[in-house]
């Protein structure tokens, strides 16, 4: 078992770190205050090859492995969660799901521009009345000749107003005795007639990122845009969540690290009663816990990335990583604020933003409660991963970089 990173991994991490630290860190506080997305972020991520980091070169990507994807997400969220969220929805939910389930024609038409960053994608699954219960979604699509006609609304969609394409799951067979088998997935051009999008303001966190809604009114979608067979929408969606949760877990690991680094720096300079608070044992306890959690979270996401490289289903492992890392990041951010005292209550220091940003990840892409049920199902033997018609792609360096 080799825990070392390759020179390519180190190079990838440096590209992501330099971008986040040098280009985003100096401006993110202002955009967070204004509750506006950083206007150049997505374009730069495309130019640097970050958006297509783990997509084969033949489909416009950088051809790097899934460990590289995790390292990128860790570095991005160490600066701001909005950057990692873009990776989760564009790369995780949309691009990697297309790589797994799309036909060759669909990959050429949609995946190539997504990987290059010339088009932006998102995943549209959550609805006003359907979040964790995916099978309860009400948005629908009816076949009409060589098209489907979509109607309905999606809510809490990251990049909704910025994306060009959306991977959308809707009901195509409302009469199905098993609701999950009545869903189908489509790639929808968000510039189509009948599509409207908008932003949601007043969020607790991720204020430097775009979160919004999408409505579909008699939107015609070519049947050729269906991802998978009719009735496979639930399986496609669950595959998307596996990809997305991996990016959430690795990103949350970066947030833990950011909280740790900020706390160590502050504790060494802040004095109480004539001594740096770093010498106070209760402060040391908090910092030690952050350090432990960072190492555990990192090992969990690297394990999931290793399995993804092998092309193995890792729903259980991504669930472990997602639940632990997101809960640990929320705890680390709260403790970082506590260590900073009154300054932590002000946006003068980044830890205030870390705390606000960290809360969302224990809710989206499968809440902590959903992850608990998933893990209990595996432990009790009541949950078994059945074979998929389109299994996750294994990483092959020679093939992916050709």
Where are these regions (language model features)?
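Short Ser/Thr-interspersed hydrophobic loop/turn segments at strand-loop and sheet-helix junctions
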Residues: 49, 73-77, 169-171, 188-193, ...
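Short Gly/Pro-enriched turn/cap motifs at secondary-structure boundaries
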Residues: 114, 129-132, 156-159, 176-177, ...
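A short core secondary-structure module
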Residues: 146-147, 151-197
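Alpha-helical interface subdomain recognition
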Residues: 1-89, 101-106, 113-118, 131-134, ...
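Flexible, small-/acidic-enriched active-site or ligand-binding loops
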Residues: 136, 191-222
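A short, Trp-centered hydrophobic/proline-enriched beta-strand micro-motif
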Residues: 117-125, 167-169
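Flexible, glycine-rich active-site loops centered on histidine and acidic residues
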Residues: 95-101, 123-124, 135, 175
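Short, surface-exposed charged micro-motifs
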Residues: 138-140, 156
């Amino acid at each position: 078992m080799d825990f070392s990173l390759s020179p390519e991994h180190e190079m990838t991490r440096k590209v992501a770190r330099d971008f986040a630290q040098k280009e985003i860190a100096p401006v993110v506080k202002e955009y967070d205050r204004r509750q506006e997305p950083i206007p150049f972020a997505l374009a730069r991520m495309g130019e640097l090859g970050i958006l297509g980091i783990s997509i084969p070169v033949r489909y416009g990507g950088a051809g790097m492995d899934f460990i590289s994807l995790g390292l990128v997400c860790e570095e991005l969220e160490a600066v701001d969660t909005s950057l990692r969220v873009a990776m989760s929805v564009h790369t995780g939910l949309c691009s990697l799901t297309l790589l797994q389930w799309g036909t060759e024609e669909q990959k050429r038409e949609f995946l190539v521009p997504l990987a290059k960053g010339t088009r932006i994608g998102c995943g549209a699954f959550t609805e006003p009345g359907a979040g964790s219960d995916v099978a309860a979604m009400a948005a629908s699509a009816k076949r009409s000749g060589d098209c489907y006609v979509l109607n309905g609304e999606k809510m809490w969609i990251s990049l909704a107003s910025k994306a060009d394409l959306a991977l959308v799951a809707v009901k195509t067979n409302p009469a199905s005795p098993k609701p999950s088998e009545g869903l189908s997935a489509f790639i929808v051009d968000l510039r189509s007639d009948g599509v409207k999008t908008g932003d949601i303001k007043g969020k607790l966190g991720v204020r430097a990122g775009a979160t919004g809604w999408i409505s579909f009114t008699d939107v015609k979608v070519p049947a050729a845009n269906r991802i998978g067979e009719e009735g496979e929408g639930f399986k496609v969606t669950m595959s998307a969540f596996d990809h997305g949760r991996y990016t959430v877990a690795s990103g949350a690991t970066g947030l833990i690290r950011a909280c740790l680094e900020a706390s160590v720096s502050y504790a060494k300079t802040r004095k109480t009663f004539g001594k740096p608070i770093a010498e106070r044992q209760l402060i040391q306890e908090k910092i030690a816990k952050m350090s432990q959690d960072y190492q555990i979270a990192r090992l969990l996401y690297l394990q999931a990335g290793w399995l993804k490289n092998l092309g193995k289903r890792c729903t259980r492992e991504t669930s472990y990583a997602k639940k632990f890392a997101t809960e640990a990041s929320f705890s680390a951010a709260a403790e970082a604020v506590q260590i900073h005292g009154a300054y932590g209550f002000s946006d003068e220091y980044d830890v205030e933003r870390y705390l606000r940003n960290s809360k969302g990840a224990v809710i989206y892409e499968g809440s902590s409660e959903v992850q608990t049920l998933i893990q209990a199902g595996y432990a009790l033997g009541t949950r078994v991963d059945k074979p998929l018609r389109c299994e996750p792609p294994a990483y092959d360096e020679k093939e992916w970089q050709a």
